[in-house]
């Protein structure tokens, strides 16, 4: 699955392609959209060096079918006091799900065939995208858009 920069970049690419009306709903809540781009991956950063209930929840969410989250998210968006804020987060999460779902089969196949770890593939993919975009992977803060 892609890592931080790939999700950030994909979300930015998607945002500019959305219809103007939808983009205008998201833009005031861009930090929520940006947070949604990382889906449950954000839970992996909580006490990252040890297993705990938060990162286990992140792993469990990755194992569930997307409909579990999206059914709940639809209810939240429909009942939220600020529908556009909830929508911004949910649409960011949709981007996360779409990119993971597309890339995951390739990553898993490459992992099986090469012996390279899932994390190594994610890291190198992010590094390739960073270099392609003119950034130094060693110095670029990939999570600078998350507030």
Regions found by a protein language model. Name each.
Residues 89, 93:
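Short alpha-helical catalytic segment bearing the HExxH-like zincin motif
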